[in-house]
């Protein structure tokens, strides 16, 4: 058993919600199990039959929409960018905006009962712009992958 599978979460859902603006049902990361700031992050999404998208996708044969797998990976990328900020930077004042997704590939369906492992790694960083590679895995098999570009920006004051 890998350390990522055996250890307690690095971030639980409450810690994740302090960083990401998403909320259920659109929060697609349940926990972070490994993080190396500036390098990589591994997160999980437990896919249950109670997911609202299964009502219409597809009745009688529920399959997680591929675009939501990509969204889960993008949320993991945002977590990695924020967790990679320096100690002098204020996490509460930052938000990550997705700029592009390239090379998306889907290998097999994700269904109720699957645990989606979200593996993201930094490819390149230039200032506030991040290029990351994301791979979604279920039971050791790649189910989706894509390249992401995002910008870490200041949140507007409300």
UniProtKB/Swiss-Prot annotation:
UniProt GO BP: fatty acid biosynthetic process; lipid A biosynthetic process
A single GO molecular function term of this UniProt record: (3R)-hydroxyacyl-[acyl-carrier-protein] dehydratase activity
Gene3D superfamilies cross-referenced by the UniProt entry: Hotdog Thioesterase (3.10.129.10)
Major localisation: cytoplasm
Reactions it catalyzes: a (3R)-hydroxyacyl-[ACP] = a (2E)-enoyl-[ACP] + H2O
Gene Ontology CC entries for this record: cytoplasm; membrane
Keywords carried by this UniProt record: Cytoplasm, Lipid A biosynthesis, Lipid biosynthesis, Lipid metabolism, Lyase
Places the protein is found: Cytoplasm
The keyword Lyase is annotated on this UniProt entry: yes
Enzyme Commission number, as recorded: 4.2.1.59
Main enzyme class: lyase
Stored HAMAP family: FabZ (MF_00406)
Record-stated family: Belongs to the thioester dehydratase family. FabZ subfamily.
Stored PANTHER family: 3-HYDROXYACYL-[ACYL-CARRIER-PROTEIN] DEHYDRATASE
Name of protein: 3-hydroxyacyl-[acyl-carrier-protein] dehydratase FabZ
This protein's encoding gene: fabZ
């Amino acid at each position: 058993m890998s350390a990522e599978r055996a250890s307690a979460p690095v971030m639980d859902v409450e810690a994740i919600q302090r960083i990401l603006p998403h909320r259920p049902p659109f929060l697609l990361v349940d926990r972070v199990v490994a993080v190396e700031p500036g390098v990589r992050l591994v997160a999980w999404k437990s896919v249950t039959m109670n997911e609202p998208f299964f009502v219409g996708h597809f009745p009688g044969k529920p399959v997680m929409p591929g675009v939501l797998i990509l969204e889960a990976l993008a949320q993991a990328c945002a977590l990695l960018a924020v967790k990679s900020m320096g100690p002098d930077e204020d996490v509460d004042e930052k938000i990550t905006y997705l700029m592009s997704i390239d090379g998306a590939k889907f290998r097999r369906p994700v269904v109720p009962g699957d645990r989606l492992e979200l593996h993201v790694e930094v490819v390149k960083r230039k200032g506030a712009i991040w290029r990351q590679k994301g791979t979604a895995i279920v039971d050791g098999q790649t189910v989706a992958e894509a390249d992401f570009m995002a910008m870490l920006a200041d949140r507007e004051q409300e």
